[in-house]
Design a protein with these regions (language model features):
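Terminal peptide-recognition signature
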Residues: 5, 19, 72, 102, ...
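Modules that initiate DNA replication and primer synthesis
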Residues: 1-28, 187-215
Length: 215
C-alpha cells in the first residue's frame, strides 16, 4: 500500500518503492525480498535439475492442430491468440496422444523449454525432458517496463484473452509463465527465486514493475 517518510519528504505506492527508497536495496534485491514474504534475508537462486542439462526432447508433431485448438477454445482462450501462438510455433499438437505442448525459446529462437498437457479429461501434464525453465513459455513485448507472471501457460493465455476482451492490445504486454506453482518457504533463506524471473531481470534492465497473477 501507500507509504510516506515525512522527515525525508519521500513516499511511494508499493512495497517495492519502500525497499528501494528507504531500505536502499537495488531492484533485484527488492523483488527477491517481496517474493520471499518480505524478509530482509535473501533467498537463493533455483538450481537446474539434472535432467535439464540434457538436450530438449520435443515430442513428435501432429500434422494438424485441430484437437489443440478445440481444447484451448473450450478453455475460453481467444481464437486469434491461439492461431498466432500456433503460427509462431509457441504451441504445437503432439503425437500420438494429441497433447498441447507449450514451447519457450532462447535469444537465438532455439526451443529450450516445452511443457505438455493432456487435451482430454485426464490431468496428465509435465515438462519435456531437457526443458530449461529460464526459457519458459511467454508472450513478450519490448520496453514495457513491467512483466506479468503466471503459474502456467493456460493462466497466461487466459489473461491475454481478458486483455483483448477489455479492448487492450495483448501483444503490448510482457507475459511470462513460471512453469509451475511458486510458494516461498517459511524460512526465507530456504526459498528460491524462480529461475525464470531471475534470468528475466538480468536480461531486461528496463523492467521496474512486476505484476503477480498467482493462485
Amino acid at each position: 500500500g501507500k507509504w510516506m517518510w515525512w522527515s525525508r519528504g519521500i513516499g511511494g505506492k508499493s512495497a517495492l518503492d519502500y525497499l528501494i527508497k528507504v531500505r536502499g536495496m537495488d531492484f533485484v534485491e527488492a523483488v527477491q525480498t517481496i517474493m520471499g514474504n518480505g524478509s530482509a534475508s535473501y533467498p537463493t537462486y533455483e538450481n537446474s535439475n539434472s535432467y535439464e542439462q540434457q538436450p530438449l526432447l520435443l515430442p513428435e508433431r501432429s500434422p494438424t492442430s485441430d484437437v489443440v485448438v478445440e481444447y484451448l477454445f473450450g478453455r475460453g482462450i481467444d481464437y486469434e491468440i491461439i492461431n498466432e501462438c500456433l503460427d509462431k510455433e509457441l504451441i504445437i499438437e503432439s503425437l500420438p496422444y494429441h497433447n498441447v505442448v507449450f514451447i519457450g525459446y532462447d535469444e537465438n529462437k532455439e526451443p529450450k523449454y516445452a511443457a505438455y498437457r493432456a487435451t482430454n479429461q485426464s490431468r496428465i501434464m509435465g515438462d519435456c525432458t531437457g526443458s530449461k525453465k529460464q526459457y519458459s513459455f511467454r508472450l513478450t513485448a519490448e520496453n514495457t517496463g513491467e512483466v506479468h507472471l503466471f503459474e502456467c501457460a493456460i493462466d497466461l493465455l487466459s489473461y491475454a484473452t481478458l486483455l483483448k476482451l477489455d479492448g487492450k492490445d495483448w501483444r503490448q504486454f510482457n507475459l511470462v509463465s513460471l512453469s509451475g506453482v511458486y510458494s516461498p518457504k517459511q524460512k526465507i533463506e530456504d526459498s528460491k527465486v524462480p529461475v525464470t524471473l531471475s534470468r528475466l531481470l538480468e536480461k531486461d534492465k528496463t523492467i521496474r514493475r512486476i505484476v503477480l497473477h498467482l493462485d
